[in-house]
């Protein structure tokens, strides 16, 4: 694989270590496995990204896991962390799947220093101080730009990527699907989100599309997206401390499992109302609760099936 540095990435911290894979590493343990070397090394790595101009003053760290694979056609999947902003843990949770399916794991960490709350991360920075921000400043834009950087570095020649997010990351991912143009995404997997922006206009943004930037005539292309809702069947705790309990959120269901199903059924109903083709899918994972490590193998399998069908 021809891996080279590229001059336009302003700030880059290169990291690597050759270690055995593990799914339960803590943030500190994975950091210990990282040492300075070339861009996107084998095993664990990280780099600092600030090359998207509208957000260049708000750099983020991107963690990676590269399996033992030397061809330049390695598939890429973005893995989005939850509200704890622990991207390195998420990368560790995906290491075994990376080796099994030979996929590059890319885990951006949307840090609290520059993106301090759910409005900046889970909601994509769309709506701050009671007003919509400029679309070019939405954090959704980081994904395609990081992917372009990886392509330009000659790490891979693939033209598309997958994206998965768990919990708060699932919130980011389903809004990424609704409010950005994910033309390079081959599969979009929101998993175990705490609450949703529903794909209808009966609720006001951010709980629905009423008063949002998404016009109803755009729903046709949104319902054609390769979106797969992935839910842990045991993610049913109505008293979870981090579960949003506003009236609008409670109308979606009493726990994450119910809310995920509601997100799917309301979108399907809206598509039927408008006589639109509906490509979204929903899958449940037995014996798994609110756990990224528990959901990762099923998400990786869904991504691999997408690769096999293309």
Label the model's feature ranges.
Residues 23-76, 86-89, 131, 135, ...:
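A domain-start/cap signature at the N-terminus of enzymes
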Residues 95-100, 177-184, 300-308:
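Short, surface-exposed basic-aromatic patches at helix termini and helix-loop junctions that form
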Residues 109-113, 194, 288:
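Short beta-to-alpha linker loops that shape the active-site pocket of alpha/beta-hydrolase fold enzymes
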Residues 264-310:
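C-terminal catalytic histidine-bearing segment of alpha/beta-hydrolase fold enzymes
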Residues 186-272:
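The feature captures the conserved acid-bearing segment of alpha/beta-hydrolase catalytic domains
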Residues 83, 233-236, 287-289:
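Acidic beta-to-alpha connecting loop that harbors the catalytic carboxylate
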Residues 1-32:
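Bacterial Sec-dependent N-terminal signal peptides
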Residues 53-63, 73-160:
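Serine-hydrolase catalytic machinery in alpha/beta-hydrolase-like enzymes
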């Amino acid at each position: 694989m021809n891996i080279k540095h590229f001059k336009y990435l302003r700030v880059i911290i290169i990291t690597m270590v050759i270690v055995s894979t593990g799914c339960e590493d803590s943030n500190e343990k994975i950091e210990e496995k990282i040492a300075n070397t070339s861009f996107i090394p084998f095993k664990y790595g990280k780099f600092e990204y600030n090359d998207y101009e509208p957000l260049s003053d708000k750099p983020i760290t991107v963690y990676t896991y590269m399996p033992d694979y030397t061809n330049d056609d390695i598939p890429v999947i973005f893995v989005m962390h939850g509200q704890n902003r622990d991207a390195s843990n998420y990368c560790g949770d995906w290491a075994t799947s990376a080796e099994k399916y030979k996929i590059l794991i890319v885990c951006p960490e949307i840090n609290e220093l520059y993106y301090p709350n759910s409005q900046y991360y889970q909601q994509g920075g769309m709506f701050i101080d009671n007003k919509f921000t400029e679309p070019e400043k939405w954090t959704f834009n980081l994904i395609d730009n990081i992917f372009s950087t990886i392509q330009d570095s000659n790490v891979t020649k693939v033209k598309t990527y997958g994206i998965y997010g768990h919990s708060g990351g699932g919130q980011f991912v389903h809004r990424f699907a609704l409010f950005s143009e994910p033309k390079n995404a081959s599969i979009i997997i929101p998993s175990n989100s705490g609450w949703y922006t529903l794909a209808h206009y009966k609720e006001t943004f951010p709980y629905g599309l009423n008063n949002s930037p998404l016009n109803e005539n755009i729903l046709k292309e949104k319902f054609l997206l390769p979106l797969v809702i992935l839910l842990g069947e045991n993610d049913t705790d109505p008293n979870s401390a981090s579960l949003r309990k506003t009236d609008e959120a409670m109308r979606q269901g009493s726990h994450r499992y119910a809310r995920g199903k509601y997100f799917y059924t309301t979108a399907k109903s809206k598509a039927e109302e408008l006589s639109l083709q509906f490509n979204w899918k929903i899958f449940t994972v037995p014996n798994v609760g609110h756990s990224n490590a528990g959901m990762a193998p099923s998400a990786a399998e869904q991504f691999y099936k997408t690769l096999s069908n293309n």
